[in-house]
Amino acid sequence: MGSAGESPIRFGFVTPYFQGLDWARHCEVSGADLITCGEGPTVFDDPTLSLALYAEATTRVRLGPSVTAPGLPHPAVLANTYSTLQKLSGGRAYLGIGTGDLSLIQIGERPYRLDAFLEYALAVRGLCAGEEVTYGGKPLKLEWTAGPVPLWFGADAPRALGLAGQHADGVIVGQAFHPDIVEHVRQHVGAGAAAAGRSLDDDIEIWYVLRALVTDEEHGAIRIDGLDEYAARQTFFLWRMAGKPERSELAAELARRKGLTIDDDVAERLSGFTADYDEALAFNSKHNVHLLERYGLTDWAGRLFYKSGPLEQVVAQVGELVAAGATNFLVPFMVGDTTKGVDQTAELFTALRASRAAA
C-alpha cells in the first residue's frame, strides 16, 4: 500500500490559448490543481487576460503563467498585474518567470543572464508583498497590494535549479521526461535549498511538464501528425540545452547539465541530426522529421519525449517518474479536442493514484 507520508500526485494543464470559461470550469471539476498559460508575445494569447477570465470562472484551481519573461514589462508593472490577479482570484495566483529564452528571442531581444533575472524576479516578488525594493539602483514600492504572490522559476540547467532552490517558492521544469532527469532536478534544487536553510519538500513545489497521451499503439504519440515535428524540435533543443557540444563531449554534457545518460551510438546519431537540422523549417514542415528517421532517432525520441500508449502502459511510464520523486505534473494540450484531453488526463491520474496506492 502507498505510504501515508507520500506527497500527493497532482496535475494541471498548460495552454497557450484561451480555451473558454466552460473549459476552465471543466478542468476544475476534473480534479486539476492548476491552470497555467504559456507566454510568447508573437505566437500566443496574452496570458494575463486569459488567467483573469479563468479566475472569474473558477473557485479552487491556482492560476499563473508558465512562464513570463523578465523585461517584457517593468517590474512594477508585472507586480501590479499579478497583484491584481491575486485579488481577482481570491489568493490563487502565482507568478512563473524564466530568463526569457524564447519570449525575448521572438522579439529580437537577448535573454537575461541569471544574475539580472534574479534581480528582476526578486524585485517583483518584493513589490507584490508590499515591500520597498531597489531595482536598477532606484527605490520602488506599490501603493497597494493584495498580499504576497508565490514566485516560481522556470528552470532546467543546474545553476538555475540551484537558484530556484535558494529563492523560489516553486519550480517549473520544462524537460523532465526521464527518471534520471527528475533525480537531477531534485539534487540541484535540494542543494540550493540546503544552502539557504530551506527544505526541498516543505518549502518548494516542483512541477514537471508531462507530455502524456493515451494511444492505441505503444509509444504511439510520435506517429501523430504535429507531434513528430515537436519531437524533432525537442531533440535539437536537447542538444542546445547541453551547450551545443561537439560530438566528443555530447554524452558528458547531457549527463552534467541534464542528468540524462545516452550511449555512444545515440550521441553519434544526435550529432549528425543537429548538424543537419534546419531551424527555419522547425514548424509546419516534415524536413526535420525526416532527419529523425534518417538518423534512426524516431523511436528513441518518441520514447524519450512522450509517455504514450494504452492507458496501463502510460500509467507505468509516468509511474517511473513518480518513483524518482516527481508528483506534480503540468500537461500541455498538443493535439485534438482540449475538453476530451482534460477527461483523458483526469482518467490517467485517477489510474496513476490507484496504482501508487496499491503498490
Task: Annotate each predicted stretch with a short phrase.
Residues 16-27, 78-81, 154-163, 310-320:
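Short, acidic/polar
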Residues 46-68, 72, 120-127, 191-195, ...:
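Alpha-helix-loop-beta-strand connector modules within alpha/beta enzyme cores
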